[in-house]
Amino acid sequence: MGRTLRVAILGATGYTGGELIRLLHRHPGAELSFVSSERFAGQSIAKVYTHLQAVGHLICQPMDAKKACEAADFIFCALPHVTSMEVVPELLQRGAKVVDLSADFRLKSAETYAHWYGTQHLAPELLPQAAYGLPELFRESIKGANLVANPGCYPTSVQLPLFPLLQEGMIDPALVIADSKSGVSGAGRSPAQGTLFAELSEGFKAYKVEAHRHIPEMEQNLALAAGKEIKIRFTPHLLPQSRGILSTCYLRPTSGVNAQRVRDTLMTRYRDEPFVTVLPHGDMPATSDVRGSNACHMGVTEDLRSGWLIIVSVIDNLVKGASGAAVQNFNLMTGWDETTALDSLPMFP
């Protein structure tokens, strides 16, 4: 068991920040001591999020790295991309451990970051140091890290089923298709026309086709599993619901591989993982099965006519896809049991 640490959340009034507060409130090793928000500075967090009345004593402060480090030992950085890399170097220099929920430290190549995010990386020297924070795949490197790059939500839903199969040479790395659907909270809390109720309700659309910024993150990590470069065909879609990601992956199996072998491989790989469930033959997951939880459920089948494998995985984009994974990383970095504060059952209906 780890010790109790003072914890800060920078960018506490976005959806991931609010979800971090909800999860950390029940963590015996986390004392929330500092929350920041430029927009809501001076206001109670309960004024910003009325469901957080139990922590109404928390007052949003302007973003100040020095004050955050004076108030806390461990910092969750839930700031936007680019803003985060302006702040994280100072946090580390002041001795804080950091989980960063932006994309600023997920990619190992500063050139790749510049290509996909349209700006030069301001702290390229930190990229090799940042541990990629998907515990089921990179647990040991997370434990010893001072900086963890929390994964993107889509990559979490795709990498968990695909990584073991690429490691075992069970699927063709040249033929990987991921078709993903996300609830609108994945777009963040800032007002935008595309996320208005009238724009989303009773509709369903693809967006950023072949141009989503999570593509290089998936290709980088899946290439580690495959031992060679991989190009993924990835199409994200926006669902008219608040939470949840469902990813359908279409895969060409290698010789002698069928759905049962794939299911057995995934079951063996994740048998001792508390948050991953591989469903039995004939069952497929739904986003409602994991709502509000840190769980990932996946189902496996095959198209006998084409010979292709189909894997469906679901997560809650705000929990396993963001804040839940961040708390899981906090637990690993500070010596707490990995499931601490994350063992709640999903909400249904």
From Swiss-Prot:
Its EC number is 1.2.1.38. The keyword Transport does not apply. It is an enzyme of class 1 (oxidoreductase). Signal peptide: none annotated. Belongs to the NAGSA dehydrogenase family. Type 1 subfamily. Catalyzes the NADPH-dependent reduction of N-acetyl-5-glutamyl phosphate to yield N-acetyl-L-glutamate 5-semialdehyde. This is N-acetyl-gamma-glutamyl-phosphate reductase.
